[in-house]
Structures are given as C-alpha cells and as structure tokens.
Amino acid sequence: MTAVDTNVLVRIVVNDHPAQSARGAEFLRQQDRVFLAKTVLLEVEWILRSAYRLGRREILAILRGILAIGSAEVEDEAAVLQAMRWYEEGMDFADALHMASAGTQRFVTFDRALQERARRLGIAKIALL
C-alpha cells in the first residue's frame, strides 16, 4: 500500500496543473489500496480554504469525494467522519479533528470560542484552562 501526499489530492481536485492532475488521478485508478493519513486530509482542508478560498460546503464535498475513493484506506476514519460532521456544523476542521481523534479523552484548551462551539454542538468533553 502506498501513502498519498496532500499535493497529489489537491492537484486532482482543483486541476490547476492538468498534467499533474491527470498523473495523480491515473495513479489512484491503478492502485488496489492507498493510505490517506488524517493529517493529509487536514492539510487538504487548510489548502482549499486558505489558498483556493473555497467555502465550507465545497470543501466538505471534496473531502467526501476523497473518502469515497474505492482504493482509499483512511487513518482513523471514524474520527475523520466525526470531524467532518462537526465542521459541517460550524467548527474549525482542525479543532474538530483534534477533538474527534482524542476520542473519549477530555480535551483542554485556552480557546473560549472553541469551547463555546463545542458546547453548542453538545460536546461535553472539552474543558477551558
């Protein structure tokens, strides 16, 4: 199994470099299994939001498309899916992924806004220091 870097996924979805987009897509089609680290998905969201100025709905559609790649094995997929649900409800994707990855562990922060967003979403495991 081969792990796929962020830039391969971004090139495929934004198609801003047609030759690399085509090579990346062809590579994925030829693979039985590829590994997608959750940190790669975190970077994909950040790049699409910050560099390409895509909105939350567009980013979620792209992330769902990436997760639907038949050959993809996603690291901690349950946490990624939970983070995507929280992101859809307005939480920052990085914060959501950090909290989802913590599982049932208590999550502490200095970020009052994060604590408030989590409280509104019914996430009780977050504590403000």
Give short role names for the model-derived ranges.
Residues K38-V44:
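Short, conserved active-site loops that position catalytic residues or coordinate cofactors/metal ions
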Residues Q115-L121:
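Short loop/helix-cap segments at secondary-structure boundaries that form the rim of catalytic
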Residues E45, R49, R64-L67, M84-R85:
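Amphipathic alpha-helical segments within well-ordered protein domains
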Residues N7-V8, T39, R112-A113:
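Alpha-helix/helix-capping structural signal
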Residues R56, I69-Q115:
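Active-site neighborhoods of divalent-metal-dependent phosphate/nucleic-acid chemistry enzymes
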